């Protein structure tokens, strides 16, 4: 778990941030970010703010956390890895693609059911997703963090028959968190297993049905770290500091991300935080 001592020092780090990057931006400095789509709306706002304040050009690749990690590895470039959960950050650290000492926790996430606004199918809980006639989507658990969380929840709570019925109801394995939200927002499915914050990405078309506390295995968090492919570690670290600034934290707050473990626990109950989950082979081979 990342020490909160860093957060206490973030104000000082951000204080020197703008002076340092003014010089760098004059030389045409750029940053390339590989970002899990679990933070897409607030990250887009934060990037624009960073560019406006510093003049530094920031390019962002959004997608499923596993997929963008693969892209970063194949490209052998990138300054920041900013996945949607700890699962893929642990892999990136283990395989040497980020500097472990630069990892910080940005916000926390809780899995939930997301349905069309008004809940026309009257979905009340997890078991309803296995009922006949319900169209469901989950993110692809092979490369999208929220898909792995969905599988973890199904494996914990469903009987063999319920799991079989649930799989029959799946009409789409989406490629990112953003696309998971889109399929329910466009009424292509009745429900998804996503994040509680999805409702606040698009409140006009989506609402959240909380899972029961005992159905949720763990609370997730969104980490950020400097990539070992970076050519400008100093600037990359300054971007990390900026993301942890109060100004950016307030942007995440507007979208109802949880800023602490305690906030997440107040919503769902106390749970293990972070970690990794090995998706069973039956979910990754032919599904």
Annotated model-derived regions:
Residues 1-5:
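Positively charged n-region of N-terminal signal peptides that target proteins for export
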Residues 8-19:
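Bacterial N-terminal signal peptides
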Residues 20-61, 66-76, 85-86, 90-95, ...:
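Exported/periplasmic ABC-transporter solute-binding proteins
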């Amino acid at each position: 778990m990342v020490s909160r001592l860093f957060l206490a020092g973030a104000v000082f780090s951000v204080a020197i941030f703008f002076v340092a990057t003014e010089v760098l931006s004059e030389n045409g400095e750029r940053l390339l970010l590989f970002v899990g789509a679990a933070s897409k709306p607030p990250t887009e706002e934060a990037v624009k703010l960073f560019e406006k304040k510093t003049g530094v050009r920031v390019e962002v690749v959004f997608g499923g956390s596993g997929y963008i990690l693969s892209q970063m590895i194949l490209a052998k470039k990138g300054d920041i890895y900013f996945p949607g959960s700890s699962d893929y950050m642990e892999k990136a650290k283990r395989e040497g693609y980020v500097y472990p000492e630069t990892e910080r926790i940005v916000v926390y996430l809780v899995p939930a059911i997301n349905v069309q606004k008004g809940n026309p199918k009257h979905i009340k809980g997890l078991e309803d997703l296995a009922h006949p006639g319900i169209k469901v989507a989950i993110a692809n658990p092979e490369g999208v963090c929220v898909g792995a969380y969905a599988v973890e929840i199904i494996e914990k709570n469903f009987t063999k028959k319920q799991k079989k019925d649930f799989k029959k109801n799946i009409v789409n394995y989406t490629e990112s968190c953003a696309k998971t939200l889109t399929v329910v927002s466009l009424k292509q499915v009745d429900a998804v297993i996503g994040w509680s914050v999805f409702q606040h990405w698009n409140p006009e078309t989506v609402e959240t049905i909380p899972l029961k506390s005992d159905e949720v295995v763990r609370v997730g968090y969104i980490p950020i770290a400097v990539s070992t492919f970076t050519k400008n570690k100093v600037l990359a670290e300054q971007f990390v500091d900026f993301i942890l600034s109060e100004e950016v934290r307030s942007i995440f707050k507007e979208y109802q991300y949880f800023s602490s473990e305690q906030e997440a626990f107040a919503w769902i109950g106390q749970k293990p935080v972070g970690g990794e989950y090995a998706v069973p082979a039956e979910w990754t081979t032919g599904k």
